[in-house]
Amino acid sequence: NGWKGFAKITFATFFKNSLFISIVATMGTLISSSLVAFGLSRCKFFGRRALFVAMLLSMMLPAQVLMIPQYLWYQKLGWVGSYKPLIIPYFFAIQGFFVYQISNFIDGIPRELDEAAKIDGCSYYSIFFRIVLPLITPALITSTIFSFMWRWDDFLSALLYINESAKYPVSLALKLFCDPGSSSDYGAMFAMATLSIMPAMIMFFCLQKYLVEGISTSGLKG
């Protein structure tokens, strides 16, 4: 019964919404974080160290501190009520954790490879896509797992910005089973809660080998 959803909106719709948000946001995180990490690790420019320190400091800020300013900003942009606040910011490397992780991995790659590529006439873009990117695959897969799971389980952001039931992700749709004004359907709620963790579990078990490899290699190189 839980799969039937609410108000003619099936639970499959909520699953599709969560998959869309999680996959697109994860892609944005990987693309932006890897590019920024490469720039901080390999490119020399004024203020690089200050930018790196600022990124580390941003990791220490609780997300709740930024919620009100972010909401007001997204409201001015007209993004409230859409998926834009849940997706677009991740294309700008807003999560320092992934930048730091990938940057540490890139630091472990011998710079002699870059120098040899420059002698052959490669630009920074060629070095990144042809040399660095294939070598940081374990770090990218590790980041994929963490990013997907965090986006899939994100409840508070969806609660702030999504105001239509048809756009609810799974994390937000589950609360619809809990009705404080009447009896809650606990059977359906537990069944859907169990199904809701399946995508993250499947991804974790399929990529577990790469996750362990990425963490162990990052630890050795860091």
Task: Name these PLM-found stretches.
Residues 1-222:
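A structural signal for multi-pass alpha-helical bundles of membrane permease subunits
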